[in-house]
Structures are given as C-alpha cells and as structure tokens.
Amino acid sequence: MTEPERQLAEPSAAIEPRIVALVCTWCTYAGADLAGTSRLAYAPNVRIIRFPCTGRIDPLLVLKAFEGGADGVLVSGCHPGDCHYTSGNYHARRRWAIVRRLLEFTGIDSRRLYFSWVSAAEGRKFADLINEITAKVRAAGPFEPANPARRRPWT
C-alpha cells in the first residue's frame, strides 16, 4: 500500500486536533503547571486560557473558540466547594448545562465540549484529562462548521 493510500485508509491518523482549555487560575491552571513542572507527558495541542474563575467565563467564548478553529473545548475549574470565590464553580456548572443546549442549537456537537474539575494538586489528572480529550476529539475528526467561510485558521 502506498503512503497516500494508507493516509486515505486511516484518515484519523493524520488529524491533530486543536483544543482550547478555558481554565480557573486557582485550581486547573495550577494543576496544569504542576503537570508541566512534574514533567508529565500530555498532548501538546491544547491552548490554555486562564480566568480568575470558571464562573466568569462567557459562554460566547466557547462559540468563538470553535469559530477560531478549535476542534474541542475544555472548561475546567475548582472542585465543588473549593472555589476561591465561594460559589463560582456552582454558577459555572449550571451555566454549562445550558451551553450544551446552545451548542446543539447552533449545530455544534455538544460532545466536543468537555467540563471537568481539576485541583491544584492534580497534575496527573490534568495530564490524563488532556490525553483523553485529545483521543476523543481525534476520533471525532476535525470540527466542520456549517459555514466553513467563518472558520478562521488556527494560528
């Protein structure tokens, strides 16, 4: 089998997913930092954007991430009850249940949005989470918007 035939037979092998992670500064970002300083291996194709709290993340940023070329989006913050701002993660949990319905309405498969809790001490969990999401998004294939002209290149 020639190389082009092999690539056509295994299209998912050539796909390197682009993932945007919208994370809490106090917990998940610190967990990502711990994963890095501990030299834990995780997929390099994630772009981390940190926020003071997941409760402060505007749902439109998820749509903007997909419009900007993301194949998957992770929203991650402090475990329930551990929020630096007392109730921000509870607010986020309620909000993201609604965002999933918004994604379905706009034609985006809600399985491309991931929500997780990662504390500052869970570097291994962060690395495993990123690897798991990367594998799932790779299996799902690249995100194809309804209007491809609106998708900007990933830079």
PLM segments and residue spans:
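Iron-sulfur-associated redox domains of electron-transfer enzymes in respiratory
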Residues: 1-155
